[in-house]
Curated annotation (Swiss-Prot):
Designated gene of the protein: bcs1la
Official protein name in the record: Probable mitochondrial chaperone BCS1-A
Cellular compartments annotated: Mitochondrion inner membrane
Swiss-Prot/TrEMBL keywords: ATP-binding, Chaperone, Hydrolase, Membrane, Mitochondrion, Mitochondrion inner membrane, Nucleotide-binding, Transmembrane, Transmembrane helix
Domain of life: Eukaryota
Xref: InterPro entries: AAA+_ATPase, ATPase_AAA_core, ATPase_AAA_CS, BCS1_N, Mitochondrial_chaperone_BCS1, P-loop_NTPase
Function noted in UniProt: Chaperone necessary for the assembly of mitochondrial respiratory chain complex III.
Length: 421
C-alpha cells in the first residue's frame, strides 16, 4: 500500500513539475514576445527605416554608393568584389558591406546599414534573395531619402555617355561587365548602302509606337538578325546603335556551361530596362533543328542543359518580356533552323557582306581623316574587288601604314583574301 502511495506521489510530482516547466517556459516566451513587441514599438517611434530589395535597381545603386563611401571602409566586415574591365586592363577590387550590421556617418549623422541574405533562393535566378535596411533617428529621416537620391545620381552619372555591358553570370542574374564603354560613333561603322539608317529608323519606330502594339494586341518586342561573312562589323554595328539610342547591351552566352532552360527564360525576360539583348554566333549554339533534336534526346535526363525548345519558349513564351529588342548574329544563316528565325521571332534580317569598293574608299577617308571623294581614297579602292575582302582585313592592312596613305596605296595589291570562317 505504501508502495502505491509513493508511486502516486511520484506521478503527481512529475505532472506538477511538467506543468510548472510548461508554465514557466510559456511565461518566458510570452515575456519575450511582449518585450520584443515593446522594443519594436519603441524603435518605430525612435527610428526611421527603409528596406531595399535586391530585385530592385536601387539595390545596385546603393551598393555602388557604399563602395565609393569612405566611412564604410572602417567597418570590421567587408566583402571584396572584383570588377572586370575591358580586355588588356587590370580588374578592380571594390569593398562593399558584407552580410550583417554596419554603421556609417552621413552628413554628420549616424546611419545604420543592415545587409540581410535570405535562406530562400530565387529559383529563377539561382541566387539567394537579399535586402539592405537603412535606418536612422526619426529626426534625421530626410537623410535616408537624400542618401538614396545621391546613390541613384552617382550611379547614373557613372554611365552618362557610356554603354553598359551586361553578361549572364553563373547564378543566372545579369551582371555588369567591367566599366561602361565609351559610345561608339555610328559614323565609324561603314556599311553598304543605307543599312544603318534602315535599321536605326526601324528601332526608333518600334520604341515610339508602344501604344500601337498594345492597342492591336501584338506582342511588343522586336527581333533582328545580322548575318554574313565574319569581320564586317555586325557586333560593331550593334554597339554603335546602342550608343546612338542610349541603350545598354546584355550579351547572352549560350555556350556557358551553367545556362539551362530555366536560366535562359529568366535572363531573356528580366533584362535591365533600356537595353538590347544580344545573342552572338547563334549558329555555333544551334546549328540546325536536327542536331538539337538529337541533343535533346541525348540529354532528356539532364535538367542542367539548354535545349532548343527551351530557347524558343524563352524567345516568345507567354512570359516574354515586353519592350524587348533582340539581336542575333551569325556567319552562316544556312545553318539556322527556320523556326528560330521565323517572323515574330526575327522581324528583320540584314546581310552584312564583305566590303565593296565604296566601303573601302569610305574606310580610307575615315582612317586618314580625309575629305569625302578624296583622290587617294579613290585610287586605293580601285585596286580592290567588290566583296573580296572583309572590312576588318582592310582595316588591319591600313593599320600597318597609319601615317602613310600613299604607302598604303602602293602596297594595296599585297592584301591577300583569306577565309575567316
Amino acid at each position: 500500500m505504501n508502495h502505491l502511495k509513493d508511486q502516486s506521489k511520484s506521478i503527481v510530482l512529475g505532472i506538477s513539475s511538467g506543468i510548472g516547466i510548461f508554465l514557466i517556459s510559456g511565461g518566458i516566451n510570452i515575456f519575450k514576445n511582449v518585450g520584443q513587441y515593446i522594443l519594436n514599438r519603441i524603435n518605430s517611434n525612435i527610428y526611421y527605416r527603409i528596406d531595399v530589395d535586391s530585385k530592385d535597381k536601387s539595390f545596385e545603386w546603393l551598393l555602388y554608393w557604399l563602395s565609393e563611401n569612405d566611412s564604410i571602409k572602417v567597418s570590421n566586415h567587408l566583402n571584396a568584389e572584383t570588377v572586370y574591365n575591358l580586355v588588356g586592363k587590370n580588374p578592380k577590387v571594390i569593398l562593399v558591406p558584407s552580410v550583417g550590421k554596419h554603421r556609417i556617418v552621413y552628413k554628420g549623422k549616424w546611419i545604420w546599414i543592415d545587409r540581410v541574405r535570405d535562406q530562400q533562393f530565387d529559383m529563377g535566378a539561382g541566387a539567394p534573395f537579399e535586402s539592405i535596411s537603412i535606418s536612422t533617428y526619426k529626426s534625421n529621416a530626410q537623410l535616408i531619402n537624400q542618401l538614396l537620391q545621391e546613390a541613384m545620381t552617382l550611379s547614373l552619372n557613372r554611365d552618362i555617355g557610356k554603354t553598359v555591358i551586361y553578361i549572364n553570370g553563373g547564378n543566372g542574374n545579369w551582371e555588369r561587365f567591367g566599366n561602361p564603354r565609351s559610345i561608339r560613333s555610328l559614323s565609324s561603322v561603314i556599311l553598304a548602302d543605307d543599312l544603318k539608317s534602315k535599321l536605326i529608323e526601324d528601332i526608333k519606330s518600334f520604341i515610339t509606337n508602344e501604344s500601337w502594339y498594345r492597342n492591336r494586341g501584338i506582342p511588343y518586342r522586336r527581333g533582328y538578325l545580322l548575318y554574313g561573312e565574319p569581320g564586317n562589323g555586325k557586333s560593331s554595328l550593334i554597339n554603335a546603335i546602342a550608343g546612338e539610342l542610349n541603350l545598354d547591351i546584355c550579351i547572352v552566352s549560350l555556350s556557358s556551361k551553367d545556362i539551362d532552360d530555366k536560366q535562359i527564360n529568366h535572363l531573356l525576360n528580366n533584362a535591365p530596362p533600356k537595353s538590347i539583348l544580344l545573342i552572338e554566333d547563334i549558329d555555333a549554339a544551334f546549328k540546325s533543328h536536327r542536331d538539337n533534336v538529337d541533343s535533346n534526346n541525348n540529354n532528356s535526363n539532364n535538367n542542367n542543359s539548354l535545349t532548343y525548345s527551351g530557347l524558343l519558349n524563352a524567345l516568345d513564351g507567354v512570359a516574354s518580356q515586353e519592350g524587348r529588342i533582340l539581336f542575333m548574329t551569325t556567319n552562316k544563316i544556312e545553318l539556322l533552323d527556320s523556326a528560330l528565325i521565323r517572323e515574330g521571332r526575327i522581324d528583320l534580317k540584314i546581310k552584312v557582306s564583305n566590303a565593296t569598293k565604296s566601303q573601302a574608299a569610305q574606310l580610307f577617308t575615315h582612317f586618314y581623316n580625309l575629305p569625302t571623294d578624296n583622290q587617294l581614297a579613290i585610287r586605293f579602292s580601285e585596286n580592290l574587288h567588290d566583296h573580296q575582302l572583309s572590312m576588318s582585313q582592310i582595316q588591319g592592312f591600313l593599320l600597318k601604314y597609319i601615317n602613310s596613305p600613299e604607302k598604303a596605296i602602293e602596297e594595296v595589291q599585297s592584301i591577300t583574301p583569306f577565309n575567316l570562317n
